[in-house]
Each structure stands twice: as C-alpha cells, then as structure tokens.
C-alpha cells in the first residue's frame, strides 16, 4: 500500500438547484434532492445565482414568477412533470420536461441515484444485445462458468494496422475480446458524462463498460433454481485513475410479468414483493471516515429499470458492494443487464498479433502471467476487498487474468 493519498473525485452539489413550494418539502424527491432547494419566493427575490447551474422547477409555472430571462443564465432547466403545473410545452416551452425518476437523489453523501435516468421504452436491453455478442465468463481462479454472460466495451480506434483501446485487467475472465462501442453505447456514455459533469469535481471521463446479462435458472426435477447474484467485493482499481468515477446502469428484459408496486411506482413485483435486483453496500471498516463524518455502515439500492447510480472511487474504497436477487422465484424474475461504466487509465495497442501496454516509453508487450505474479495480484485484490486504504498496484503486473485482453479488439468499421 502507498502512504500517499492521491486526489479523488468529489461529489459537488453547489451547481444544482430545485425550486419547489413549501407544500412539497416532505415529498421524497424534494427531501432527498441532490442540491439546494429554494422556494419560489426565494427564487423571485433574485438572490440565487443561476449562472451555469442546473435548475429543476416544481409547482405553478403559469405565472411570471418562474424566472423569465433569469433562467437563461442557467446551463440546464428541467420541469418536473409530476410536481408542476401550468407549463405549456406545446406553446414553445424552452425547458425540458422530465419525470420524477430523472431527478438526482442524494445517497448518504457517497453517491447520486436516478431512479429512471433512461426510459424503459427505449429498449436499451434489446439494442445493446443486438449490437454485441455477449461472451461466457469465469471469475478469478474459479473454473466453472458464471451464471451470466458479459463483454468489455470501449472506443477502439484504428491507425493503419494498429488498434488502440483501453484495458480493464480485473479478475473477470471473458472468452472473447474487448469490443468497440456501438451506437447505443456511445449515446449512453455521452449522456452519463454530461450528467457526471454536474455531479463531480476533479473527475476523469467515463470511457469503458463491463456489460453483463444476469441469467436466472429455473428449477427442474433434480435441480434447484439458481438466481443471479454476486458476493460482496470492491472493484479492482489497478487500471483506474484515483479520480475515477463509476456509473451503475440497469436495464431489464421480461418485465411484463411484474407490475408497479403501490408503495414505489418505480419498483416492479408481485403481490407487494419486489422482483428487482438490489445493490447492497457495506463498509469495509466500521470506523471509516468520509468528509469528516461517519458514513452509514450499510445501505441498499433497488436497481429500477433505467436507473443510474453515480459514485466516486472513494465510495468503492470505503465500501464493498454485492448484487442481491429478489426473494421471488426465478421463474417470476426479469433478466437484468448490468451496465457498469468506469474510467480507465490503462491504454493498449494491438499490433502484429500482440497486445502492448502503452507506457511513458515504448509500448511494452502484455506478458503471460506467472504463478508468483498471480499470487501477488490476488493478494492485493483481497486487500482491496478488506481495507479502505489506497492500494498501490504500481507497474508490477504486466499481464492480465483476462484471456480476451491478448486478442485483437473487435472494431465497428463503418462502410
């Protein structure tokens, strides 16, 4: 481990404002809003600086008290459909109309959650599945194939016979190569980067995806059902910059067997029981401190369709996270596509049939792992699961556990 603590991305809400009447102050979206909340009267006073800020409008928008030209100084203005009235979008409205799920919610100061950042009707599950051939995978030193399929995705550029891309050399071993972004990936990651710019300071851009389809196996005679899950772990940051961030996106297939729950319109289930997957966080060290305070020992997010959870790597340093299935039977569950977007600093070039790591000097060939190297890397991986300290991987590991990293990345050539 390194005793030096590199600068991390920080969550910053100073540029996000909600205008909401006092009557809405107990609404969960207003109460948990990521940013400052002011009343229409405060807003009308002109005391709030709107320059380059994101503004969410609620309440009566029919009068002149909604800001007029003052809102032109804002970077973005959203009208929250369910919490507003009097806004006539068809009459040349210049602000974007959004649903409750698109409003950012604060999660204990360690992340920001959007319950429906992407509209389920856009069928991201189908689009992503059509643009890529998902691969079988194993984890770390486990010989069995996991109950999910996946693929690494990142922009791939061709320079003559060379293919340039980014590597995530973690313990997930895929049967095929990294693939270039498809059109849907590009749109998703561009939207996430735009949003991240309003949530974080000093952060690296999102540029890499691990997409995984979580398969549930029905019970048969002589075989128990199996529901997709992943045990508690921290992401391995060997190929990530310290100021990186992460975006957990969720898309579902086969939601038609579930219905919206009365107590949460974004949740889907049967007879009051949720059929959706949960993302559970637990502190690695109970005494950990964050921004001078004590973060919660644990918390859980329901992964709603089209949801996004944004967090800095400091949250990954403090917490492990686990994927937990619904208590419903496997036959009732939808199929989930977990679409995790990260920031990678490791760059590579594939040429002459080999993958090379880009370094300060000449590119270095990606070597085959040695038993000693694998043992040391696994030791550090286990340590990153246990400690909230920074893990310094250095440049001691010129190999990958993922056999796909030794293959030429697949490129979406145009024409």
Where are these regions (language model features)?
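Non-heme Fe(II) oxygenase metal-center motifs and adjacent flexible, charged/small-residue loops
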Residues: 2-415
């Amino acid at each position: 481990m390194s005793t030096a603590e590199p600068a991390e991305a920080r969550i910053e809400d100073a540029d996000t404002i909600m205008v909401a009447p006092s009557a809405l102050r107990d609404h969960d979206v207003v109460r948990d809003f990521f940013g400052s909340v002011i009343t229409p009267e405060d807003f009308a006073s002109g005391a709030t600086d709107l320059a380059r800020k994101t503004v969410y409008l609620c309440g009566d928008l029919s009068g002149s008290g909604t800001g007029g030209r003052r809102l032109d100084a804002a970077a973005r203005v959203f009208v929250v459909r369910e919490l507003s009235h009097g806004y006539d979008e068809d009459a040349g409205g210049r602000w974007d109309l959004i649903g409750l799920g698109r409003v950012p919610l604060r999660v204990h100061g360690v992340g920001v959650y959007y319950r429906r950042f992407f509209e389920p009707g856009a069928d991201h599950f189908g689009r992503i599945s059509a643009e890529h051939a998902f691969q079988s995978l194993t984890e770390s030193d486990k010989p069995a194939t996991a109950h999910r399929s996946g693929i690494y995705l990142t922009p791939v550029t061709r320079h003559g016979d060379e293919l340039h891309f980014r590597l995530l050399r973690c313990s997930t071993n895929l049967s095929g190569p990294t693939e270039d972004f498809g059109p849907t990936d590009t749109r998703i990651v561009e939207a996430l980067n735009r949003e991240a710019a309003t949530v974080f300071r000093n952060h690296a851009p999102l540029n890499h995806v691990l997409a995984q389809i979580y398969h549930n196996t029905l019970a048969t005679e002589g075989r128990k059902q199996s529901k997709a899950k992943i045990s508690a772990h921290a992401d391995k940051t060997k190929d990530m910059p310290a100021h990186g961030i992460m975006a957990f996106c969720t898309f579902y297939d086969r939601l038609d067997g579930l219905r919206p729950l009365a107590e949460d319109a974004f949740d889907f289930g049967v007879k009051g029981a949720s059929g959706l997957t949960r993302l559970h966080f637990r502190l690695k060290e109970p005494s950990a401190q964050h921004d001078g305070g004590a973060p919660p020992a644990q918390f859980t997010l329901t992964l709603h369709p089209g949801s996004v959870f944004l967090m800095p790597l400091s949250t990954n340093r403090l917490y492990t996270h686990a994927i937990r299935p619904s208590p419903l039977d496997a036959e009732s569950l939808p199929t989930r596509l977990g679409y995790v977007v990260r920031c990678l600093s490791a760059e590579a070039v594939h040429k002459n049939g080999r993958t090379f790591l880009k370094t300060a000097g000449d590119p270095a060939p990606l070597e085959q792992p040695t038993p000693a190297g694998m043992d040391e890397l696994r030791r550090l991986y286990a340590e990153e699961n246990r400690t909230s300290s920074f893990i310094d991987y250095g440049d001691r590991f010129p190999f990958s556990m993922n056999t796909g990293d030794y293959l030429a990345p697949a490129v979406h050539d145009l024409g």
